[in-house]
Curated annotation (Swiss-Prot):
GO terms for cellular component: plasma membrane. Keywords: Cell inner membrane, Cell membrane, Membrane, Signal, Transmembrane, Transmembrane helix. This is Motility hub protein FimV. Residues 299-312 have a biased composition (Basic and acidic residues). It comes from Pseudomonas aeruginosa (strain UCBPP-PA14).
Length: 924
């Protein structure tokens, strides 16, 4: 599914790439229509508007995040800007940028965001605001008018001041002559390229024309100056940010010095306009200023007044006029010098261009000469053709300084004269170019160098083909990735299968049972098994309802731990599902977890209905079969340990006594001794549970059933202290002369381990198999012990009381008529023990303790734990080891099988030893 989505996305991307011919909305340049200290009025050109309406184009100021990404400060006064789209169907469409308040900042730098149906546009704009109609020359020429206007002396000087301003003409294609209303911002904006910002172009103009600015400030451009236009490379010498910071510094410097200068200029302009506005104005000013000194009345009153006073006034008037003329001459000289510098710089630039052209021609000659002599002849005409052009340009420029040299003499008319010669020389070389036949020669040479466009050039020039090729390459790449992913998935699957195949071999090493491997299987105090609490870890839950499907995916990739966790969680939710448990058994088999395998097998056995599938799993994973043998041996050892710690305190028996002879010393215990472990597992051993038939001619153990072979031996050993097992019987005191048999409840028969130990001899308590049961004694199913309360206050078992069928009594008592029946019953006990040995995996629950309320507390005797109940001795343990050795042989573990067979040779009987030797011969 993921691959399909990736393919769909790739096709969508390819379709987007193929639509390269679609046109989109664009933003052009900004045109400023306002000045400093005025409300902003500007227009941004809209490109490729086509059928869009004004409602579909939504311009606005960019968000603060976009400003921060672009590295531009979003100042507060920018929020006053309003953007209004003006979409014209057949005309020029623009975005009007206006503000409601006057803009007092010398420049504005902001980001414009335009939203339209097909996308979004974002562009940065920088606007430099100049003062309205500011010109330094106008303020400088104003004082000349009032000095010369009132009389004939100033008449010829009035038209001379604006002469250099109005006689403007372009000096060439690489230069520009300023006029009174020009600003450096507009000049730089017209002559820059798209790669160059306006501040970069302004600083390049200032660097090439330092004399065209007052005090070296870009805001004080002189009018009538010939500016050299910088190239794009010169404009790009500074970064946009560096150029913007320098422009800001010059703007701040200009603003700091603008107020006093403007005040002085304004005062001078105001004074001049008052004097030229009306004829009556000079009469009011004459009382205090120079009008009286330059008036004609000074000559008339020269003879009438006293001589010293009239002469001083005339001299002062002449001195003032002379100073004014000197000041005017000085300014004209400075202006002429600046023009001379501009011409000289222009001449230097032309010479550099000529050198560059010569170098290019020389390079072309070298290239053509290497190709052949035929191509060298047309190339030879190129320098000849270019030399007249260079010669025509060179004399034209020296001619201008020659004509300008005599200009300082006519102080007033000199500025107009040098302005004409630079204009006249350019047409002269144009007229001389047609006679030169070699000039058009470079065109064929250049055309010959450009070969016909190749297929690659046509391909690169066609965006549609580029989009198709790009989409095809992308699709091919996606197909390749899909093939690689499938190959990797197949490889992982093969690795998982190989891992599953080798799992059996890897698990054989984990099964290491040494010679003493069963010595640790001891349980001193067996407790009921309680399921362990699930660990508090993050559960791997099924993403879908099919937990088996997800588990199969994990198994295919070899992630057995995650599969096991997933199945365990699913079993926790649905414990009755056998298919989940079977899958979990398979995962445990792959992981080599024998305990988990056996645990799930037991769970399935309890649930039922899945035994054929379990057998199939066992056949598929023979390594797990050894678990059964190990479990059987472990169960046998566990049962032995439980019987080692067996005490009569754990039994609850009902004893019922019948009529006994008052003078009897004791009763035969084997008359009614019935100990069945099958009944012990059920709870109380009452009258219904323990069944015994006491007959007059035989006393036997009817249903003596144990978990292993039981050896019963008569104990005749000497008295010795009890070490491990306290085997005590608490008997109730009987009446001195009971007339009727008393029915005692064996449920109250208890074993007191804390009772004081009395060391009694064998004579105190004699377990006799020879005493005859009285003929009058009726048969009873109860466990009956008849004691003489008068003679024995407390009875105890002998120290060497051992129920072992393996060892026969060495010195049995003289057999009487009950001895034959006892031997027959021993055979029945052996058969029952064999039957119980096959069901060791189903242990019975522990029997509850019991006590006798009517019996007195008797002292308990301790018995040796090692000799009390030896149920797992002899042939059964050796047979189990033989079964385990066969399982090892089936798994291929020869060393483990050989070790176990050696133990059987040392511990087993003759038949088992013979079978062990046969297996060893097969291994050899």
């Amino acid at each position: 599914m993921v691959r399909l989505r990736t393919l769909v996305r790739a096709i969508a991307a390819a379709s987007v790439l193929t639509s390269g011919m679609a046109h989109g909305l664009g933003l052009g340049e900004i045109t400023l229509k306002s000045a400093l200290n005025q409300p902003l009025d500007a227009e941004i050109e809209l490109l490729e508007v086509r059928d869009l309406g004004s409602g579909e184009v939504i311009p606005s100021l960019a968000s603060p995040e976009e400003f921060s990404k672009a590295g531009v400060d979003r100042l507060y006064y920018l929020t006053d800007l309003k953007f209004t789209p003006v979409v014209k169907p057949n005309g020029k469409s623009v975005i009007r940028v206006t503000s409601s308040k006057p803009v007092q900042e010398p420049y504005l730098n902001f980001l414009v965001q335009v939203l339209w149906p097909n996308g979004r546009l974002l562009r940065e704009y920088t606007v430099l605001l100049d003062p309205p109609l500011y010109s330094p020359q106008a303020a400088a020429s104003a004082p000349q008018a009032p000095v010369s206007a009132p009389r004939a002396t100033g008449a010829p000087r009035t038209p001379q001041a604006p002469a250099p301003v109005r006689t403007t003409a372009p000096a060439g294609s690489d230069t520009y002559r300023t006029v009174s209303n020009d600003t450096l911002w507009e000049i730089a904006q017209r002559n820059r390229t798209d790669r160059v910002s306006v501040p970069q172009a302004m600083l390049a103009f200032q660097e090439l024309n330092p004399g065209a600015f007052v005090d070296g400030n870009i805001n004080r451009l002189k009018s009538g100056q010939v500016l050299r236009i910088p190239t794009e490379q010169q404009m790009l010498e500074r970064s946009p940010r560096e150029a913007l910071s320098q422009v800001q510094a010059q703007n701040q410097s200009w603003r700091g010095s603008r107020n006093p200068a403007a005040g002085t200029a304004g005062a001078r302009q105001l004074d001049a306009t008052q004097r030229n506005a009306a004829g009556s104005a000079p009469s009011k000013v004459d009382a205090t200023d120079n009008l009286r000194l330059v008036s004609g009345e000074g000559k008339a009153s020269k003879g009438a007044d006293k001589g010293g006073k009239g002469d001083s006034k005339a001299i002062a008037d002449t001195l003032a006029v002379t100073k004014e003329s000197l000041d005017s001459t000085r300014r004209e000289n400075e202006e002429l010098q600046s023009r001379m510098q501009d011409l000289q710089s222009q001449l230097d630039k032309l010479q550099k261009l000529i050198q560059l052209k010569d170098a290019q021609l020389a390079k072309l000659q070298g290239q053509l000469g290497a190709e052949g002599q035929g191509a060298a002849q047309p190339n030879a005409a190129l320098p000849d053709a270019s030399q007249p052009n260079a010669a025509a340009q060179a004399p034209a420029q020296p001619g201008t300084p020659a004509a300008a040299a005599p200009t300082p003499a006519p102080a007033g008319e000199a500025p107009a004269a040098p302005a004409q010669p630079p204009v006249a020389p350019p047409p002269a070389p144009v007229a001389e170019k047609p006679p030169a036949p070699a000039v058009p020669a470079p065109a064929p040479v250049q055309a010959a160098e450009q070969p016909a466009p190749s297929f690659l050039d046509e391909l690169l020039a066609n965006p549609l083909w580029l989009a198709v090729i790009g989409g095809s390459a992308l699709l091919a790449l996606l197909v390749l990735l899909m093939i690689l992913s499938r190959r990797n998935a197949q490889k992982e699957k093969e690795e998982a299968q190989a891992f599953a195949a080798d799992a059996g071999e890897e698990q054989e090493d984990a099964l290491d049972l040494g010679k003493d491997g069963f010595d640790d299987l001891t349980l001193d105090e067996p407790e009921p098994q309680v399921a362990a609490a699930a660990p508090q870890v993050e559960k791997t839950t099924a993403q879908t309802s099919d937990a088996l499907g997800e588990a199969d995916i994990y198994i295919a990739y070899g992630r057995f731990n995650q599969a096991a966790e997933l199945l365990q969680n699913a079993i926790y939710d649905e414990p009755q599902r056998t298919d989940l448990r079977l899958k979990l058994m398979e995962v445990y088999a792959e992981m080599g977890d024998r305990e988990g395998f056996a645990r799930q097998e037991n769970e399935l056995r309890e649930i039922g209905g899945a035994q054929p599938q379990v057998e199939q799993l066992k056949s598929r994973y023979p390594a797990m079969v050894a678990v059964a043998a190990v479990a059987g041996l472990a169960g046998a050892k566990l049962a032995q340990d439980e019987l080692d710690s067996f005490s009569l305190d754990d039994l609850s028996l009902d004893d019922s006594g019948h009529a006994a002879k008052p003078d009897a010393a004791g009763q035969d215990l084997d008359d009614a001794f019935d100990l069945s472990l099958d009944d012990l597992g059920g709870g109380d051993l009452g009258s219904d549970d323990v069944q015994a038939d006491l007959k007059s001619d035989s006393g036997a153990l009817d249903d003596l059933t144990l978990d292993s072979d039981l050896d019963l031996a008569a104990s005749t050993a000497a008295d010795k202290p009890v070490d491990d097992l306290d085997f005590g019987l608490d008997f109730a005191e009987l009446a001195e002369t009971p007339s009727q048999p008393k029915h005692d409840d064996l449920g109250d028969f208890s074993l007191d381990l804390d009772a004081p130990e009395d060391k009694l001899s064998d004579d105190d308590f004699l377990l006799s198999l020879n005493d005859e049961v009285p003929a009058a004694a009726p048969a009873n199913n109860e466990f009956t012990l008849d004691t003489e309360a008068a003679e024995e206050p407390a009875l105890s078992l002998p120290d060497d009381f051992d129920l072992s069928l393996a060892d026969e009594p060495t010195e049995p008592a003289a057999p009487e008529k009950g001895e034959d029946s006892f031997a027959a019953q021993l055979d029945e006990v052996s058969a029952q023990l064999d039957e119980l040995a096959s069901n060791l995996d189903e242990p019975k629950s522990a029997a509850p303790s019991f006590s006798a309320e009517d019996a007195a507390v008797a002292s308990a005797l301790d018995g040796d734990a090692d000799d009390d109940f030896d149920f797992l001795s002899g042939a059964d343990e050796a047979a189990t080891k033989l079964d385990l050795a066969r399982a090892y042989i089936d798994m291929g573990d020869s060393e483990g099988a050989r070790d176990i067979l050696d133990e059987v040779l040392a511990e087993g009987n003759d038949s088992q030893q013979a079978e062990a030797r046969e297996l060893l011969e097969r291994l050899a």
